[in-house]
């Protein structure tokens, strides 16, 4: 994978901090304090969206939305326009989920397309990964990205954390995590998140049907 677009200056904090929420679905998160993942209904209907001043957003196709091909295609086709928005500073959450969504082969195709857009626009990637870390590791080795890939909501064991860190991933920790994995993650590769709001899972599940 090669960069074909001059990366803009990223608005995300270069150095992780305890008071920055790296991944939330709370549309009312305070400006400059969080990376807000926009829901699928907003991505499909941009005319309903008004960006709040100073708020940073991420956009992507969630794995749970991949088992409806028409919906997945509609969301992916809208990504380029969203990625050109000056307040969209990351791609995601996107990724692979072995328990929900389309077949992993199909999910991998969708994810690869999004990773290409992230590389083109010079944007970091927020990854949702469930029982598919081997495939994500293979993708990173194959694509050699120039932008950060962060596994959000990481709950894995220390051995998996070490494997991901050695491969160049960053890790984001939420309310539930393995303390040993957290401790061994260097601060410069460690993010913190809330993954709020309460209805986020219901939204993704509804749009994946």
What are these regions (language model features)?
Residues 1-209:
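Mid-domain alpha/beta scaffold segments of enzyme catalytic cores
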């Amino acid at each position: 994978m090669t960069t074909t677009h001059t990366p803009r200056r990223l608005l995300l904090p270069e150095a992780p901090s305890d008071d920055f929420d790296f991944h939330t679905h709370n549309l009312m998160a305070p400006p400059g304090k969080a990376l807000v993942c926009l829901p699928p209904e907003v991505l499909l209907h941009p005319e309903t969206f008004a960006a709040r001043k100073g708020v940073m957003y991420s956009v992507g196709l969630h794995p749970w939305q991949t088992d409806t091909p028409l919906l997945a295609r509609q969301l992916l086709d809208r990504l380029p326009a969203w990625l050109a928005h000056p307040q969209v500073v990351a791609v995601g959450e996107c990724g692979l989920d072995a328990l929900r969504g389309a077949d992993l082969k199909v999910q991998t195709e969708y994810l690869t397309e999004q990773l290409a857009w992230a590389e083109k626009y010079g944007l970091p990637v927020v990854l949702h990964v469930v029982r598919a870390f081997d495939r994500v590791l293979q993708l990173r080795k194959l694509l050699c990205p120039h932008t950060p890939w962060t596994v959000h909501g990481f709950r894995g064991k220390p051995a998996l954390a070490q494997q991901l860190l050695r491969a160049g991933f960053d890790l984001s920790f939420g309310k539930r995590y393995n303390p040993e994995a957290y401790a061994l993650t260097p601060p410069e590769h460690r993010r913190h998140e809330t993954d709020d709001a309460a209805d986020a899972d219901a939204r993704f599940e509804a749009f994946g049907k």
